[in-house]
């Protein structure tokens, strides 16, 4: 698996200061995508043990709120084994940090993914240019995309989780 970006201090992709990984490869190719350079599976550089060590070191700070996984599309089948292992190790070492992930697919299309048990918030849905959100910090590109709270790989239907997701969508 390749990646096109790693940010140790990201404030645009989820709440608080986060570590963000942008993976390479996306077969969806949404019109108006902000990250077209990520479409190729060979873009960027290979994800290695050294890359993972950089992520873990960056996460090992009290002021880092969590980890964000973007792309490309992290839910491409080619990424599943590497990313499931990475997310499992992140959650084992940093159980109090949140994991956010973005996909152009709907929850229904990724509900069996091995990544979901390690994700706290999933932003799902293809980017639709005519529904573009102008507001900075929207955590999603278009209004059709949803912020879905997850618990153990399933949609968290608890009132608290749903209220938090609704507030995130309304606020951002």
What positions do the PLM features span?
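Residues at the C-termini of beta-strands that transition into short coil/loop
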Residues: 7, 123-126, 151
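Receiver (REC) domain switch/active-site residues of two-component response regulators
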Residues: 120
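P-loop/Walker A phosphate-binding loop and immediately adjacent motor/lid segment at beta-alpha junctions
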Residues: 77-83, 88-91, 132-172
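Short secondary-structure boundary segments
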Residues: 71, 103-105, 125-127
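Surface-exposed, flexible loop/turn segments at secondary-structure boundaries
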Residues: 11, 75, 107, 130, ...
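N-terminal pre-triad scaffold of radical SAM enzymes
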Residues: 2-29
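Conserved Radical SAM active-site core
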Residues: 1-6, 17, 35-99, 107-112
